[in-house]
From Swiss-Prot:
<feature type="domain" description="PPIase cyclophilin-type">
    <location>
        <begin position="1"/>
        <end position="153"/>
    </location>
</feature>
<keyword id="KW-0697">Rotamase</keyword>
<comment type="function">
    <text>PPIases accelerate the folding of proteins. It catalyzes the cis-trans isomerization of proline imidic peptide bonds in oligopeptides.</text>
</comment>
<dbReference type="GO" id="GO:0003755">
    <property type="term" value="F:peptidyl-prolyl cis-trans isomerase activity"/>
</dbReference>
<dbReference type="Pfam" id="PF00160">
    <property type="entry name" value="Pro_isomerase"/>
</dbReference>
<dbReference type="InterPro" id="IPR029000">
    <property type="entry name" value="Cyclophilin-like_dom_sf"/>
</dbReference>
<dbReference type="InterPro" id="IPR002130">
    <property type="entry name" value="Cyclophilin-type_PPIase_dom"/>
</dbReference>
<dbReference type="InterPro" id="IPR044666">
    <property type="entry name" value="Cyclophilin_A-like"/>
</dbReference>
<comment type="similarity">
    <text>Belongs to the cyclophilin-type PPIase family. PPIL3 subfamily.</text>
</comment>
<dbReference type="InterPro" id="IPR024936">
    <property type="entry name" value="Cyclophilin-type_PPIase"/>
</dbReference>
<keyword id="KW-0413">Isomerase</keyword>
<dbReference type="GO" id="GO:0071013">
    <property type="term" value="C:catalytic step 2 spliceosome"/>
</dbReference>
<dbReference type="InterPro" id="IPR020892">
    <property type="entry name" value="Cyclophilin-type_PPIase_CS"/>
</dbReference>
<protein>
    <recommendedName>
        <fullName>Peptidyl-prolyl cis-trans isomerase-like 3</fullName>
        <ecNumber>5.2.1.8</ecNumber>
    </recommendedName>
</protein>
<dbReference type="GO" id="GO:0006457">
    <property type="term" value="P:protein folding"/>
</dbReference>
Amino acid sequence: MSVTLHTNLGDIKIELFCESVPRTAENFLALCASGQYDGTLFHRNIRGFMIQGGDPTGTGKGGQSIWGRPFSDEIRQTLRFNNRGMVAMANAGPDTNKSQFFITYAKQPSLDGKYSIFGKVIDGMETLDSMEKTPVNPKSRPLQEIKLLNVTVHANPIADQAKGGLA
């Protein structure tokens, strides 16, 4: 199961961990498939740490889950921030996941157990490199827009299962 984030700097393909974190994957996939992420900005960019997006307001304060309220963390000991390109839900504390997500630029072991990891970058590291090199203001907001144009969902087992198809 994978998606491709089409950005103005290039594409990033992400493998999703649907079996390990089904609720988080369902939320992300549904937001992708419904176009909720289309045209949104990556509003926070910290070199050596991560880039954050998924807020339709572009402020870092907006966004909502598909259930209309925050949902619980899915922390798994087998999923760790042990590589560049790990993808996780951004939150404001335990069990406050909505629509915002981030992609790491490096190993971040201090984040383990605090954020629901739901995927990893499997193609497009050069795009991630370009994002990381984008200059930012003192509040870590990119000086040049980094925009998520749209998302391609390559296979959606959750939707297929709901339609009675093969999972």
